[in-house]
Amino acid sequence: MKKRIICICMAALLSLSFLAGCGAEGNTDTEQDAAAQTVTVRLSEVTHSVFYAPQYVAMSQGFFADEGLDIDLSNGGGADKVMTAVVSGGADIGLAGPESCIYIHGQGKDDLPVIFAQLTKRDGSFLVGRTDEDFDWSNLKGKTIIGGRKGGVPEMTLEYVMRHNGVEPQGDAVVDTSVQFNMMAGAFTGGQGDYVTLFEPTATEVERAGHGYILCSIGEESGEIPYTAYFAARSYMDAHPEVIQGFANAIARAQQWIVEHTDREVAQAIIDQFPDTDLDTLEAVTARHRQIDAWNAAPMMARSALERLETVMTEAGELTKAQWVDFDALVDNSFAEKAMESMK
């Protein structure tokens, strides 16, 4: 009898072990299936800035994850470098000024980059000077402004605004284009130039450190232009339309999320992206971007906005009217439009 009881107990234990093993195996299969369904997207951004808050909101709020996307984010350090990464296959999607796409289209390459979503709708940089002056654009005459890479949207927009305020670049004032984009703040605080254009949170950090003063928003002066947008090689878009659609969906949700939430809530959502910046600074910077209406509320690009950018490029001498790109060849709004439809 005793032996029989022992045998029954051992059989029960073996059954429980088998069931537990099946359960563990089932969980592993589920986890593996979930991992298999997640697609890693290599995203190269032109710089790391609060200006791109909707992107970081999409990451922190799980909007990309909801679409089965895992974002591998890298800082390209300039639009030209982002474009190089995309066309060489080093990145799947790029975030930079559309001018980089326009230049490539003018070269007649086979696998051209195509814009599928717009993130920001005006220049997000701020003019920083060495004194807390009562600023007028005429103050730039006889001075040197660190303006970024020649042919880049920040530099061209600065020159566009200067001309429209009666200051001729390289005539009335010098626009220094020798400093790399990610070195501009360091050059200015190191004593180079009289003014510099900086993105946030760098502009506020320079001001709070006592190295300069924010004088005006370049974007408020320039008007709306498609300042930064997402693009991918046509071959990648054709091969992975579901990835592009999911990406556009996440960005559209994030843009709407920002509209519906306070500056403090936006700052809290993106703070992990800026570990060296405190919450109050991020809130102030977010408010500044909202005040100048920097972010798109929807990811579609307007034809008129692209034409204004091409006007800026033409006035800068980087593009002739004959080199203007066909809108439909450069921009595919279908993904952005579907993203907005899915939110209704």
Q: What are the roles of these predicted feature ranges?
A:
Residues 1-40, 340-344:
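Short, low-complexity disordered leader/linker segments with a strong preference
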Residues 91-94, 290-304, 335-344:
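Short amphipathic alpha-helical segments at helix boundaries and their inter-helical linkers
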